């Protein structure tokens, strides 16, 4: 069984109550970065036990692999509440040794352009371009953080950019208008630091830290790259709780 299959089965066990996928975790070295879950395998077991069988539905719509890392993009339904999440699993010697995630409440209506937070393509292409596509996203984020906005049009095809963020429309004009509208509501998007860039072929995930309004926030931005341009975007953002409210001391990143 592949690392991707292990990751998907572990997430699905939240729904099924099957404890066998917990055996994919290294009990001696597992590090948890979900700040609402206690550290180690015992902390994860306690979290799973707190979600009785049948109360959570899990649908993983995408899974990608980059070296020792697996990235998944999933829908989680807990009662009447639906959340969208990216999970990152790091593997060593065939076992899961570290986990990060980022969750956002799903909206009840689509984006201004009619897209949902998880729909769209999922099949990997251009695996030979993985390194180039990750480097492209590093350059984009470097320019974004440095405020070099004059370079932005060069990263997009303009009218061929599909946006799955629920508050933002398609294309570069939709992106700019959406961000301006959020800023007027006191919810300006600001990136301060990139922590990880992971990818497989034409899909790249950027894990970053910044502010959403006045809240310290984790940004997970997931891109589909086509012909060296940003063609499609999905994301989740999650406020980082203050230290006194965290269940482990490993940090969000």
Q: Predicted regions: what is each one?
A:
Residues 1-253:
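C-terminal and inter-domain tail/linker signature
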């Amino acid at each position: 069984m592949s690392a991707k299959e292990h990751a998907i089965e572990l997430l699905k066990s939240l729904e099924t109550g099957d404890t066998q996928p917990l055996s994919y975790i290294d009990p001696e070295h597992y590090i948890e970065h979900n700040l609402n879950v206690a550290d180690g395998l015992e902390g994860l077991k306690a979290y799973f036990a707190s979600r009785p069988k049948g109360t959570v539905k899990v649908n993983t719509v995408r899974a990608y692999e980059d070296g020792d890392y697996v990235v998944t993009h999933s829908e989680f339904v807990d009662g009447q509440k639906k959340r969208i999440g990216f999970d990152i699993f790091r593997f060593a010697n065939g076992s899961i040794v570290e986990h990060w995630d980022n969750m956002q409440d799903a909206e009840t209506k689509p984006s201004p352009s009619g897209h949902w937070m998880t729909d769209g393509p999922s099949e990997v292409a251009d695996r030979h371009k993985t390194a180039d596509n990750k480097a492209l996203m590093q350059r984009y984020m470097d320019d974004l953080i440095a405020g070099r906005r004059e370079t932005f049009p060069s990263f997009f095809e303009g009218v061929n950019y599909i946006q799955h963020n629920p508050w933002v429309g398609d294309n570069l004009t939709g992106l700019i208008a959406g961000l301006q509208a959020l800023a007027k509501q006191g919810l300006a998007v600001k990136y301060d630091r990139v922590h990880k860039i992971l990818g497989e072929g034409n899909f790249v995930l950027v894990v970053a830290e910044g502010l959403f309004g006045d809240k310290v926030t984790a940004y997970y931005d997931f891109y589909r790259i086509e012909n060296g341009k940003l063609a499609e975007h999905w994301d989740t953002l999650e406020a980082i709780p203050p230290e006194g409210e965290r269940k482990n001391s490993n940090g969000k990143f």
